[in-house]
């Protein structure tokens, strides 16, 4: 029987994402000047105020206020009427030194014996329903907001947009679990107060349907067939949305973990990513399990897979690895037998040190993850510039989204006897 499935996304100007981006900008700057930095940084944003709190062990000294303001400026909070503005907002730092009790559980005489930074379970998921092995509903929700942000920055076709926005996409699937059409789209976007309420809302809905949607279809033609004249559009369904961003809602690091991952598909262990250096397995192991899942599906082992790993704090070896193929495996093995083989593959060594080395996680690569999802993104090398409080600048070439590489497909095929 056909069924519906829904995923949501939020824009870079959503208050929780503002917090995520500030936290990850701090991570990047610490790692740029001291690759062995240990950092856990939480951010709170509200009307005219940013609060930074967390624990750090690093040789680097940063101007955290300027880093936070730079992120806010880049997002687009640059007008006083937003009641949260890069130049004038207060920035309070309560960042202090990391506990020695925690650090002793991570550091070892032998790097290879580095313990997990915490206990917990992490999940990686992949499906072949899209070219980047991500759930389609989430992909579409991200694309809508990426294009909406592009329209805001261009300030040509739509001139009233403000940074805060959310989207939601509902897909209809057939009996074979294949997406066949978009059933509903929700877009809520912050905007200037430019006309009477009813006239303003009618204009926004018209622009979303006639400008944003065609732009998404043109830029992503592989999705175009899913759009149809029966889509139910809900554009700013609560009414006008002038007051938004951190002035409308307080934002906190780590509150959009489903947007960050798989949009409700698969599973989530509960640990957020942003603001954590890679010694925290909440982040590094979630990336590593995504890397495993994507390579398994790309190799043709299965159509869909969920990989779980778990750790005890201070212990290098995982306490468990679990694989679920949802009955789509192409080999005559149980999911447990597949997991056993994966555990023995050097290219999927799940000890924290080896994850860091394999995925190059000690590089300043995290700011780009903090909006529009950590998974399914483009693996590429970029040059980034970082400036210390004394004015010293360094340039770094950084490989982004290393966990999206399909560099283990050949080995998976060999181990599982796939052609």
Language model segments and positions:
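Glycine-rich anion/phosphate-binding loop at the beta-strand->alpha-helix junction
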Residues: 196-297
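Internal helix-turn-beta structural module
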Residues: 46, 304, 311-419
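Short, charge-patterned binding micro-sites
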Residues: 39-58, 313-317
């Amino acid at each position: 029987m056909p069924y519906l499935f829904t995923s949501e996304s939020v824009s870079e100007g959503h208050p929780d994402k503002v917090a995520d981006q500030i936290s990850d900008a701090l991570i990047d700057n610490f790692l740029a000047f001291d690759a062995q930095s240990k950092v856990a940084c939480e951010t709170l944003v509200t009307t005219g105020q940013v609060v930074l709190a967390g624990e750090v062990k690093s040789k680097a000294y940063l101007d955290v206020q300027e880093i936070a303001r730079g992120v806010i400026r880049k997002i687009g909070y640059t007008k006083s009427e937003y009641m949260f503005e890069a130049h004038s907002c207060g920035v309070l730092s309560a960042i202090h030194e990391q506990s020695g009790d925690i650090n002793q559980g991570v550091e070892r005489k032998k790097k290879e014996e580095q313990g997990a930074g915490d206990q917990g379970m992490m999940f990686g998921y992949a499906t072949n329903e899209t070219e980047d092995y991500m759930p389609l509903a989430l992909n579409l929700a991200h694309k809508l907001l990426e294009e909406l942000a592009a329209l805001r920055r261009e300030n040509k076709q739509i001139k009233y947009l403000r940074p805060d926005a959310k989207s939601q996409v509902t897909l209809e699937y057939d009996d074979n679990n294949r997406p066949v059409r978009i059933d509903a789209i929700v877009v809520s976007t912050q905007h200037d107060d430019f006309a009477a309420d009813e006239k303003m809302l009618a204009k926004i809905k018209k622009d979303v349907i006639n400008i944003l949607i065609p732009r998404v279809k043109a830029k992503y033609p592989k999705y175009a067939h899913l759009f149809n004249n029966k889509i139910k559009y809900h554009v700013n369904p609560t009414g006008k949305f002038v007051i938004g961003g951190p002035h409308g809602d307080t934002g906190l690091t780590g509150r959009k973990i489903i947007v960050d991952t798989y949009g409700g598909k698969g599973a989530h262990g509960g640990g957020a990513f942003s603001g954590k250096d890679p010694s925290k397995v909440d982040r590094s192991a979630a990336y590593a399990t995504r890397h495993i899942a994507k390579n398994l599906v790309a190799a043709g082992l299965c159509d869909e897979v969920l990989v779980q790993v778990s750790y005890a704090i201070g212990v290098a070896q995982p306490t468990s690895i679990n694989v679920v193929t949802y009955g789509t495996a192409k080999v005559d093995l149980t999911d447990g037998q597949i997991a056993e083989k994966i555990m023995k593959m050097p290219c999927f060594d799940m000890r924290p040190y080896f994850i860091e080395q394999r995925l190059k996680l000690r590089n300043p690569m995290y700011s780009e993850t903090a909006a529009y999802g950590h998974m399914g993104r483009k693996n590429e090398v970029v040059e980034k510039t970082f400036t210390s409080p004394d004015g010293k600048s360094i340039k770094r070439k950084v490989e982004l989204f290393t966990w999206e590489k399909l560099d283990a497909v050949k080995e998976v095929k060999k181990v599982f006897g796939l052609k």
